[in-house]
Regions:
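Catalytic machinery of carbohydrate-active enzymes
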Residues: 1-350
Length: 350
């Protein structure tokens, strides 16, 4: 009965960019299962909607709901959903149980699916599976038969002629993309939204040293980052003047960043959404991990490499525990040397 054209499905994806990328294979399977259905998604930021525009799956509508803009916008969206009359709601696996129940009650689909019905969410699964696989668990009852879990695929538009010429002029021994940021922050005091902690950051000093080693090897570097990473640029002032460095921090949209990754031999960074994007575009990635588990949170695909070792900290990965935010030394990341990262990049691009 689910194949009828009037079936309306809403998928809740109110999370970050990396989580959105990980949802793409499930959305693809959902469209294959229900080719005539109306499939809508709701995301938290416009950048997430931009990512889905490049996904290899047809979606009918992508709504942006800024959950931080107040109760009014949430009420307005819920009212719109009730007017649409969704038959099916699907919850992202890492939305908490209580938030899922509130959200589904607000939008009021005929029925909804998600692992939250079992009283769990991704953060309580203790490293059982990858984000990508968790999305399939969320829709398991709906998809019914066994589905082969595949990697996310993003298809960005082509570079402009000017950008192409700029990158080609820099290519000596290839281009390596460097995501200079420390990833999103968490709060020490979550309810008060106070005490920002960059739990996954490797440090801009390490990034600067890595960039220098790459340049000294004849490798050109393109720097990736958003508005938040612009604050780190003063720490890189001595390398920004090099003709081997292309600084795109704060200068590109998500779609443009995707285009640029296509010209890279490799993209390196910490556990960020950009690493998921690069892998989904088909580019080899080298990701630096510490408090999160690369095999559950990392880029999904056979070209993804991870720098991670539990010997650096016996409590790693600590994501989901109090230590994730309250740790004071971050030795799981600090003990990863620039040379170690550089050597793995060299192996990948050669």
């Amino acid at each position: 009965m689910y194949l009828l054209i009037e079936k309306k499905i809403l998928v809740e994806l109110l999370h970050g960019i990396g989580d959105i990328v990980c949802a793409v294979p499930m959305l693809r399977a959902l469209r294959q299962k229900f080719p005539l259905a109306r499939i809508d998604v709701v995301v938290k930021f416009q950048t997430c909607a931009d990512v889905l525009q490049c996904a290899d799956v047809r979606l009918d509508n992508c709504y942006v709901l800024n959950v931080y803009s107040g109760v009014g916008s949430i009420y307005k969206f819920a009212k719109k959903c009730r007017k649409t009359g969704y038959d099916i709601g699907i919850a992202a696996p890492h939305t908490s149980v209580i938030k899922t129940k509130i959200f589904m009650r607000l939008i009021h689909p005929v029925q909804w699916f998600g692992i939250q019905k079992q009283g769990i969410c991704f953060d309580t699964m203790l490293n059982e599976c990858h984000f990508v696989e968790a999305y399939f668990l969320a829709a398991k009852e709906l998809l019914k038969e066994e589905v082969v879990v595949s990697a996310p695929v993003l298809i960005p538009p082509d570079l402009s002629q000017n950008d192409e010429q700029c990158l080609n002029s820099k290519t000596i021994d290839g281009i390596v993309g460097v995501c200079i940021g420390n990833a999103d922050y968490s709060y020490k005091y979550r309810l008060l939204r106070m005490g920002r902690v960059y739990t996954r950051g490797w440090g801009i000093e390490n990034m600067r040293e890595l960039i220098c080693k790459l340049m000294n090897s004849g490798i050109s570097v393109v720097l990736f980052g958003g508005k938040q990473e612009e604050l780190l640029l003063p720490e890189l002032r001595d390398v920004l003047t090099s003709d081997k460095v292309i600084n795109m921090v704060g200068k590109t949209s998500i779609a443009e960043s995707m285009m640029l990754t296509k010209k890279c031999k490799c993209v390196v960074g910490v556990d960020t959404g950009m690493m998921h994007i690069a892998a989904a575009v088909g580019i080899p990635t080298v990701s630096i991990f510490g408090p999160t588990n690369p095999y559950t949170h990392g880029a999904y695909g056979d070209k993804a490499k991870f720098i991670y070792d539990v010997k650096y900290c016996e409590k790693s990965p600590c994501y989901g525990s109090k230590m994730y935010v309250k740790c004071t030394d971050r030795k799981c990341l600090k003990k990863i040397s620039v040379n170690e990262v550089y050597n793995i990049i060299s192996n990948v691009i050669n």
